[in-house]
From Swiss-Prot:
The keyword Manganese does not apply. The lineage of its organism: Eukaryota, Metazoa, Chordata, Craniata, Vertebrata. Keywords: Disulfide bond, Ion channel impairing toxin, Neurotoxin, Potassium channel impairing toxin, Presynaptic neurotoxin, Secreted, Signal, Toxin, Voltage-gated potassium channel impairing toxin. Residues 29-79 form the BPTI/Kunitz inhibitor domain. It comes from Bungarus multicinctus (Many-banded krait). This is Kunitz-type serine protease inhibitor homolog beta-bungarotoxin B6 chain. The keyword S-adenosyl-L-methionine does not apply. Belongs to the venom Kunitz-type family.
Amino acid sequence: MSSGGLLLLLGLLRVCAELTPVSSKDPYCNLPPDPGPCHDNKFAFYHHPASNKCKEFVYGGCGGNDNRFKTRNKCQCTCSEYP
């Protein structure tokens, strides 16, 4: 791995460490993906607890629940046990 890649990885790990609560992951990380009642077709990410991975789904743009993230990285930092 190049030194630039290593620095990027270390930076991401630091961000995850700052964003991840020490106690445990947030309870909404176990909720199923909810597209909501609207039909805007935006791509978002949700935490899939059985696989401990963040997966993409289509969000309608309104409503839904809190297990919804704009980026995979934010989802992993918030919900994954091992980001």
